[in-house]
Amino acid sequence: MLRCVIPSVRATATTRTFVRFASSQGYIDGIAALKQDLKKAMLAKDNLRKTTIRGVLSTIKNKEIDSKDKDLDEFVLYDVYAKLISQRKDSIAEFVKNKREDLVEKEANEIKILENYQTALPVASREEVDARVVQILTDLKESEPSIQLKQVFGKIDWKTLPGELKASPAAIRSSISSQFKKVFQ
């Protein structure tokens, strides 16, 4: 009788995090938190949190593929969360119109989950960005009282301002557009 002995292989469990080389630390930490929470949700069998996080990770992966030559940072994550929250709010409006209260509740819970991740990012809040933009616009108004909105965008140093404000360029542009009329009237 022949006996085959298979040597036992001792495997060690290691976790690997694959992120883009040029990503900021805030971005890396945000992705790591999402993946860790996904594992926890799977173990807890929390389907709502699990599907929400999977959707977020999928959206982020698509964003990485679309912007393969650009640096990714926490501002990209903030914009992704803002977009997903906006989509959920639009869905809630449609579901209320069609009297689908079960789906309204599901979308509202997803918004809470997304907002928790959005507030955890080291990014300035909308109010903080608006306050700083108003200050910048009033300084511009003092030096050039008849400046146009297009010219304001040209006067801003887009390489340093997002870092100073801890906000994405898209959030800053949106804030400038909304605050311009208030300051220049």
UniProtKB/Swiss-Prot annotation:
Q: What is a single cellular component term in the Gene Ontology annotation?
A: mitochondrion
Give UniProt keywords alphabetically: Mitochondrion, Transit peptide
Q: Does the keyword Mitochondrion apply?
A: yes
Q: Where in the cell is it found?
A: Mitochondrion
Q: Where is the transit peptide?
A: 1-21
Q: Which InterPro entries match?
A: Asn/Gln_tRNA_amidoTrase-B-like, YqeY/Aim41, YqeY/Aim41_N
The UniProt record lists the keyword Mitochondrion:
yes
The molecular function GO annotations come to: carbon-nitrogen ligase activity, with glutamine as amido-N-donor
Pfam families in the record: YqeY
User: Quick one: signal sequence residues?
Assistant: none
Describe the family membership recorded for this protein in Swiss-Prot or TrEMBL: Belongs to the AIM41 family.
Q: What is this protein called?
A: Altered inheritance of mitochondria protein 41, mitochondrial
Per the UniProt record, the source organism is: Kluyveromyces lactis (strain ATCC 8585 / CBS 2359 / DSM 70799 / NBRC 1267 / NRRL Y-1140 / WM37) (Yeast)
